[in-house]
Regions:
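C-terminal alpha-helix plus adjacent terminal tail
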Residues: 1-13, 47-48, 60, 162-168, ...
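Conserved CoA-thioester-binding segment of acyl-CoA-metabolizing enzymes
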Residues: 1-56
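Terminal peptide-recognition signature
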Residues: 18, 22, 36-37, 55, ...
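Glycine-centered loop/turn positions within well-structured domains
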Residues: 24, 60-61, 144, 156
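Hydrophobic alpha-helical membrane-association signature
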Residues: 33-37, 82, 112, 185, ...
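Glycine- (often His-adjacent) and acidic-residue-rich active-site loop
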Residues: 35, 49, 57-89, 105, ...
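A general structural signal for well-ordered alpha-helical segments in protein cores
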Residues: 69, 83, 143, 152-155, ...
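Crotonase-fold acyl-CoA enzyme core
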Residues: 89-201
Length: 259
């Protein structure tokens, strides 16, 4: 699409492929990236010739390692990163989105693939939630959708302990659908999307709506928590100390959380 700087768009028959194109930055999600993804997903929604999509990150090291930290600290509501808009778009479009995880899926990147309908992971993929380590947290999709996907205990383990999980472990816990050799995730995801595109679009759309229906009431809570509560949290001393410690590769000082 003309004018995009952070997202590459490719179509092959009924399949759309969206690639987050910031490999030098770990394919982090800044405001520009999210606005382009939101626009591309809206075009996908309204194009009758496109029946399935693939979402991936450029390069072979990173799928996405979350939000651009420098753009997440404003208390101005108008400046909140529109990441919930992207999650919501993927969740509510009556067409399937298949994630191709080709490397690290960390923080918001792990949430991003979780919100997708299916996930194909390369064998070198790594999955991790890091919020409590770096002074942040997920306020909606990354908690209850993750719980739906891997179970309550495992989801809390991922969030509370911030461990790294291999592609094999992710497959075992149900976080991904399939693991393929390194470098083959995108191609395999496109094959899966093309196969889905041969099915009834109305039936697939109805199924997706049914899967998402029981979460509709939670969406407003997710928005409130992300856009308001998380924004306020990022201004606390605790969030600042955790973020600074992570950047400096040192242990955080808990005394600075409230002093």
């Amino acid at each position: 699409v003309s004018g995009y700087t952070d997202v590459l768009v490719e179509t092959s028959g009924p399949v759309l492929t969206l690639t987050i194109n910031r490999p030098e930055a770990g394919n982090k999600l800044r405001a520009q990236t999210l606005l382009e993804l939101k626009d591309a997903l809206q075009r996908f929604r309204t194009d009758p010739g496109l029946r399935a999509a693939v979402l991936t990150g450029a390069g072979d090291r990173f799928f996405c390692i979350g939000g651009e930290h420098d753009e997440t600290t404003s208390l101005d509501y108008s400046q909140v990163l529109p990441i919930i808009d992207v999650y919501e778009a993927i969740d509510t479009i009556a067409k399937p989105v298949v994630a191709a995880v080709n490397g690290f899926a960390v923080g918001g990147g792990n949430v991003l693939h979780t919100v997708c309908d299916l996930t194909v992971a390369a064998e070198n993929a790594v999955f991790r939630q890091v919020g409590p380590m770096v002074g942040s947290f997920d306020a909606g999709y990354g908690t209850w959708y993750l719980e739906d996907t891997v179970g309550r205990k495992r989801a809390k383990e991922m969030w509370y302990l911030n461990r790294k999980y291999t592609a094999a472990q992710a497959l075992e816990m149900g976080l991904v659908n399939e693991v393929v050799p390194a470098g083959e995730a995108v191609q395999r995801a496109q094959e899966v999307a093309a196969e889905i595109a041969t099915r009834s679009p109305l039936a697939i759309g109805g199924l997706k709506a049914a899967f998402s229906a029981r979460h509709n009431g939670v969406l407003g809570q997710a928005r409130m928590a992300h856009d308001q509560q998380l924004t306020l949290y990022l201004a606390t001393r605790e969030a600042h100390e955790l973020g600074e410690a992570f950047a400096a590769r040192r242990r955080p000082d808990p005394e600075k959380f409230w002093s």
